[in-house]
């Protein structure tokens, strides 16, 4: 078993400083929780990777800063918004690959919607994220989060079968 830490543990410390904190605490496994689009730029990401490697820390996963937007921007019905956001998630997945991480964790859609959201729509959108992640060698993982669809184990079972 490996024990790791997420940079989110040190919020609102800037992500690179939070990673340095994880490294200085001698964690050998880490998650990077991005907090801003500028943190997805290659020079920034490569420097974090360099720091982690120098400290003997392996970054295994990332978490997009836009978790609170996934409900409307990835899983919502407005196609143009989805088209824009899928590009942002591609940048997250590319950053994950640069960091050596092969997992990207998402929250997904809220359990209670103002408008009904068919499960098939959710599953198709998630599958599209999986495809984009796969191109970067990254597995997109659904985190089970209270108040989100993923809080329901039966939903997750249906999602797995889809």
Task: Indicate where each model-derived feature is located.
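N-terminal pre-domain/capping segments
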Residues: 1-97, 101, 134
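Active-site acidic/histidine proton-transfer and metal-coordination neighborhood
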Residues: 16-17, 71-162
């Amino acid at each position: 078993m490996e024990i790791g830490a997420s940079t989110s543990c040190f919020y609102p410390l800037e992500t690179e400083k939070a990673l340095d904190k994880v490294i200085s605490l001698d964690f050998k496994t880490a998650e990077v929780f991005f907090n801003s689009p500028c943190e997805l730029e290659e020079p920034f990401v490569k420097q974090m990777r360099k720091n982690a490697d120098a400290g003997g820390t392996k970054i295994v996963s990332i978490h997009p800063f836009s978790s609170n937007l996934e409900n409307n921007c990835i899983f919502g019905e407005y196609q143009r918004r989805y088209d824009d956001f899928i590009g942002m998630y591609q940048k997250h997945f590319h950053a994950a690959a640069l960091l050596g991480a092969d997992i990207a964790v998402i929250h997904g859609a809220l359990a209670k919607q103002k408008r009904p959201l068919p499960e098939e729509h959710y599953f198709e959108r998630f599958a599209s994220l999986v495809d984009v992640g796969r191109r970067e060698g990254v597995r997109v993982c659904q985190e089970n989060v209270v108040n989100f669809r993923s809080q329901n184990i039966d939903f997750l079972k249906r999602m797995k079968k889809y």
